């Protein structure tokens, strides 16, 4: 049975982990890094880059590079590339595919199952979009787990004392806060809140806006009109933000950022930490209300918290730690790596699912079995007469859960009713998000009696919603899993899966061609060196044969570019390489013997 991996699919960076010996272990990617940038790029040659390779070329290829796609999950946003409109699910699937392949390389076996994390405040359509992305990437998503819950699991694995903890999760694009009670191996989420459009990206953007304004004032040039310049500036802004976490000032230095009538212009600015904190103070202030709401909903005060965990790379900013200390009156814990703990918790959840609730190889409570009890972050309602949003399941209700309520039609003789399913906290339907609509038809009508329609909401362990409506008079029932206009249909998912498989096959072919090209270059170099050292030991015919075959291989190498190589060119290169290997076999044996003798 293949292992279940845990994936933190982040806005700016993603991380993957697996349980080994009862403990979660972070898997390094092909580049040797423990996190992978959530960036996808398409080169003009048609090559697809994912991760670090994609991020490194943002400045020169900004129009064909996609980052922070997580912010658009569950929306109708599209990325237009080479005549195709790619959905956020498809872009996310490209990131997940790289993560899956890196995990397969580490484990030495196929990976088909995963637990993927999402912000606690993700709504139904965003959760479904994440599931769809996993499917497109060739993964069976066993569970969608909230990021703060995953972090709490990673913490609680080695801290079994009964306690209530607050997880403050400020990532690249989202903010979450959850209050979780840990006791006897049970993790119970008491309350959750957040903002799905607040994160490190917003702090970067403030630096970019400031730098653009400063450069416009000093050099009279508007950098926003140059995509390449903006790409470089965004990269430099992120770097400056990170520097300001440990230094009191950071330098933004971009030579030749623009060209004016008087020649090239250079950007050279100094940003102090106090100025940065003043520029971004309102962003940080947006985290206060969700924290206070979560405490209120959980029915506890800050003094009852045993620990405050900081999660997400953005919590490294000193201002975050100061605000948490002022707000909650306790020093935040630095027990966890904020970039890795979410993936580690997801891996533990995967191990529990695979082990029937127990973690193989673990000790303590984890060996006996861990239980996760999460909540739904937003109220679920239906639209009733007058455009009112009538709640059926309130936010912070434990999941899985099921709730029914009986309604009647608005008018006599009405034979059908449209059910508008809503998610949000506002009183009127128009102010909440509509997850989808469906019709119940064939209702028994009459002037003397009012039909009774039972509406049932069902939320599964992934936080995904199913709705049914039943006419109690006729027994007629309509069941649906909510699929709003922003979700993909089954046909669209199947098409995207086929496209992803084709992409993966093409990526494999590109790698094989690059490897062939590199091997051929290395062979040509070694044969050339061997000829210079051992030519006196070869007869004239053998020497000419080797030289001719070496020349043929070099002609192929000069003509062929690995990224543009077609099948004919690949076949010619492969044949030329094989031919040289055969003709130079005797030479290489002589060369190897001579080298061995020289070492002795």
Question: What residues fall within each predicted segment?
Answer:
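Oxyanion-binding/catalytic loops of NTP- or PPi-dependent enzymes
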Residues: 1-75, 79-85, 94, 101-600
